[in-house]
């Protein structure tokens, strides 16, 4: 049986509002220390790992303009997270750092996955950034506390680098990617939207022990 919220748009958005409110309350009442936006351009000295993913991908007869809009959205999301340091004991929340993607903040319509299909939505495409961060996290000592997978793979044959199962869906603010640094080391995310690739580095304050 489908949830009642799926039978009428008003019920759906009421449920979304409720979940967002609950998440804001949880953030406000939590004693967890969350990583804050970077205030300097300094880099931690050691690279722990690096990864990239292709920016423009073809999905059947989909509008490539949505792919180019995705790049605009990614640049805004990258600017919010680039340089953030996750100190020992701290938590990283994608949604807390990026905030709600709205037209007023410069986000445009891109492709997003919803209810098992590709559709347009403001801020669409920023999940590519959460996918990349999640991939780096699972190949590091960072612990994934919260992560939701996408319902299907829109690009099964177009030069996929990140396995589909490694994705991390985002829907502000209650479908989030949350990491925890349970180590005694600091980690830093350095991110960049290049010419053809979304580029990510995970840096550390100590050399990696191989």
Task: Give the role of each language-model region.
Residues 1-210:
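Well-ordered beta-sheet/strand-loop patches within structured domains
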